[in-house]
Amino acid sequence: MPGKANAVKAGDDLVKEVIKIATKLGLETKEQFHVARRIWGANRNIDVILIDPKSRKTLGVECKFQGGGGSAEEKIPATIQDIDAWPIPGLVVFAGEGFTANMKSFLISTGKAVELDELEPWLRLFFGLPLD
């Protein structure tokens, strides 16, 4: 899937691309699903919920885009921690040239994050879908 991350120019585009990949795989999607509160009290909305219509297996996806310097990278550790409080498994999907090599390494090392270009095979494994 080379080139998909290059097509993403903003966070909303990343959400749309995640939904596009999930739909292609036959998964149901829900956007901005409200579930309780974050560790500091703010409302918690999961960017995208993916549901296998057959097994009902569910995955929450947080989408993080950073095109240049900015705050998305600084918020990642809190996002990873917040996923632990979700009532379902969760994953951070990230894209953009603004993530440093160190942050990419950190994200991948958590086992809770994947670059957009690697999302489809990851979802195939998670949901037990055919491996193409």
Predicted regions and their residues:
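Short amphipathic alpha-helical segment that frequently serves as the phosphate-/nucleotide-binding helix
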Residues: D12-K16, N43, I76-I80
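Active-site metal-binding core of divalent-cation-utilizing nuclease and nuclease-like domains
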Residues: E28-S55, G70
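Hydrophobic beta-strand scaffold residues
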Residues: T29, G90, A113-E115
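Active-site-proximal loop/turn and secondary-structure-junction residues that shape catalytic pockets
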Residues: V35, F65, E120
